[in-house]
Amino acid sequence: MRRCLAVLASRHDASCAGLPDIAPVAPLAQAVRRAIRFDSAQAQVLIGQPGIARSDPDCFALTAGNYVLGGGGFVSRLMQEVREKRGLTYGISSTFSPALQAGPFAVALQTRPDQAAQALDVATGVIRDFVAQGPTPEELQAAKDNLIGGFPLRLDSNAKLLANVANIAWNGLPLDSLETWTDQIARLTADDVRAAFQRHLQPDRMVTVTVGAQP
């Protein structure tokens, strides 16, 4: 893998014109809410804000924390609060999509139009509480176990290996990124995760878009 990365770097043509710089993504100054009328049985709700670049050192803490918040399926807080306890949706998830620049953080759900406001209130409350308090040590350990245990599945084919090599090269990551990934996750503490979420998410300044029939 290191040889592949070295070859990619050696074949860079210095005479090739570089792409223009992209302006950094500006943080949101205030919350924005948009309701778009659309005749459908389900309302689509999206909550989000600018997130992080892939090179951000908080990427590992946010990855582990997001598993607890909304990336871990039925064990996540969003799924437990919005679906399991209240039956407001079949599914809800949160994602960070880091890129060269700050990619989005987003929470997505579908619900009946007459339940959209309640589902939104519950989801934003969960986000706010998680940013304020972070995960419990038990939640974080479960997330770490899942992420570390599933890591080999990200490398179990040539296509996946090549995709990881391309990701390292594209984002300018350290060449030993795959070798150290599980260690970076394993050493995280609940305080690390809480601090990272507080640095990067502003629950009271997110954009919310609801598309569907108005109740």
Stretches found by the model and what they are:
Residues 72, 97-154, 176:
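M16/insulysin-pitrilysin zinc metalloprotease superfamily fold
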Residues 47, 63, 82, 123, ...:
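Divalent metal-coordination and catalytic microenvironments
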Residues 8-12, 72, 86, 127-134, ...:
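Conserved NTP-handling cores and scaffolds of large molecular machines
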Residues 6-56, 70-117, 139, 183-205, ...:
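Non-catalytic beta-strand/loop surface segments
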Residues 109, 141-215:
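C-terminal regions of mature proteins
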Residues 1-5, 123-124:
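PAPS/PAP-binding and catalytic site of the sulfotransferase fold
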